[in-house]
Amino acid sequence: MKLLTSVPGSCVFVSVVLSSAVSAADFSAVPSGKYLVDPTHAYINMQYNHLGLSNPILGFDEFKISMDLDSASPTNTKVNVEIVTDSIDTGSDIFNEHITGEKWFDTAKNPAITFTSSEVAANSDGTFNVTGDLTVKEVTKPVMLVVTINNAMIHPSKKSPVVGISAVGGIKRSDWGLGANAPFVGDEVKLEIQAEMFIAE
């Protein structure tokens, strides 16, 4: 299971933050084009409150992230995420079986979770608001994503354009048919995404 540290902030599920050591809007070092996630440097984790006793972190081990970057006009950029639902890893085989069952993600009938962006707006602090459609268990609802850039550069060893991203966002799981045991198990779910994305060759 690929885990990150716990997610700060309030309710978060799918909000993508692309965070920057330099200017968040500075793509001058990389060209426009399609960028694909490096699976060896990428994480998608979610967190929720359990009875007020703990804040478990669950992760997905298989997913694709693509970004059609317009480096000259970043607000024209498009982002797509596809998660293999059955790749969820709770750290427990027993809990994995439970959460992939019909009561929760029902992965036999719902093999993928998807997010497709529809609009990107720049913020004064250098982040971006990304609005798009999140589909979970055949339910599609709009979600706003907050986006920043960690770095955009030519990778020092691979000599290829790369963009580093961090992501946070939030939903109420009950809005997507995942409301079992609420409010004892928190309805608000947090997500953190970290990913390095290389230009497609």
Name what the model sees in each region.
Residues S23-E201:
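Low-complexity, acidic/polar, glycine-enriched regions of mature
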Residues M1-C11:
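Bacterial N-terminal signal peptides that target proteins for export
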Residues K2-L3, V17, D68:
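Acidic/proline-rich low-complexity IDRs
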